[in-house]
Amino acid sequence: MIADKKNKCPGCKRTDCGGCGIYRKLNTNKQVRIQFPPDFRAEPAQGLGISFDVGTTTLAGMLWDLGNASLLDAETGTNPQAVFGTDVISRLQAAAKEENREKMRKMLTDKLDEMAFQMVKPFIRTGREEEEKATWTDIKKVVIVGNTAMCEILLGIKPEGLLKAPFTPDYKQIRQRKGKSFGFSFLQNADIIVLPPIGGYVGADALAVYHYVNSCEKGKILAVDI
């Protein structure tokens, strides 16, 4: 939508729409600056890491050895929030209600906990109980991406901005804290990093692709999101 002298923006009441973004000129360039944590680098580290892609329908996880960047295992699962609706809009409308939001968030953290355990299970040391528990702390870092709606639900955010134009996310920077404060159990000791969206419904999954492509050798690269 383009604002003109006869058509003021209903959001900021201006014809040049310098504020809310509902109306924008066609030649308007939009830049987003996202600050990554200092340790968010492709450098060797001790322990295990997990990456999750949280989709509306499907959840995907990968277990990594942070020491040599080798893939150890992978796991997929169905997003249990489907009982609240199978499409993004239905899910957001459900999450906008206070009585649903915490249930939906816990459904997701419980499922990701379960997937993490299934991936780590083959590598758990056998023997005394305390030795088995020690492997839980081997999971040092968990990076979570996904579409904007699923990430906001995971963070327990009331997704008001995504339900109306100009579809502005309610979080715009990386969220990082211990798993316990996110509500995780198996992953309670890990550093959880939730990447932010690029903007609107262009989510953290797209940002992850960009971050990876940016680290590749120079050349033409085609990224396809189906």
Explain the meaning of each model-derived region.
Residues 1-51, 56, 68, 104-127, ...:
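Nucleotide/phosphate-binding catalytic cleft detector across ATP-hydrolyzing
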Residues 63-102:
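Short glycine-rich, Thr/Ser-proximal phosphate-binding strand/loop in the N-terminal lobe
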Residues 226:
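Segments forming glycine/polar-rich beta-alpha architectures that bind adenosine-containing cofactors
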